[in-house]
Regions:
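Acidic/His- and Gly-rich active-site-bordering loop/insert found
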Residues: 8-120, 141-145
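Acidic/histidine-rich catalytic neighborhood of metal-dependent amide-processing enzymes
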Residues: 126-145
Length: 145
């Protein structure tokens, strides 16, 4: 466990900045993979596929996951990591469904244009899921816990 003080907090933040700057390609690849999964809010199979992907990403980071099966909507996913640091926990919260119906990818495929990513669910909230996963990865790499 790292005891944080002003000096090592600044060192850790610098390490995290450098680490994340080197992860851009990996982050975009994961975002593209997520966007390619059509997970409209009425598409249980698509939402469950997204849940499996996120669960796999979290488990690869040694996050203890618990999946809550749902009968009509996509499954819920709960993950816990980092109980080795005293103090307030860090909460990542999000959703894996989109408002886009199945088939939208044919007309609105994933693309990068002028440094911005586009595609169904890109903004709400698949990019947020990627950010959360890579934030956790950065914390682990920095020795936070």
């Amino acid at each position: 466990m790292t005891v944080l003080n002003e000096q090592n907090t600044m060192q850790m933040l610098q390490y995290i900045r450098v680490f994340l700057s080197k992860q851009q390609d990996s982050m975009l690849k994961l975002l593209e993979t997520m966007v390619q999964i059509e997970s409209g809010n009425t598409d249980k199979a698509g939402c469950d596929t997204m849940c499996s992907l996120v669960e796999g990403e979290l488990r690869a980071l040694q996050v203890e996951t618990r999946r809550v099966p749902m009968s009509e909507k996509g499954d819920f996913l709960h993950g816990v990591w980092g109980d080795c640091y005293p103090g307030a926990p860090i909460l990542f919260s999000g959703h894996m469904d989109t408002v886009f119906p199945k088939g939208t990818l044919r007309n609105i495929p994933f693309r990068i244009h002028d440094g911005k990513a586009f595609g169904p669910g890109c903004l709400d909230m698949k990019a947020g899921l990627v950010v959360a996963i890579f934030a956790l990865r950065a914390l682990q790499e920095s020795g936070f816990c």
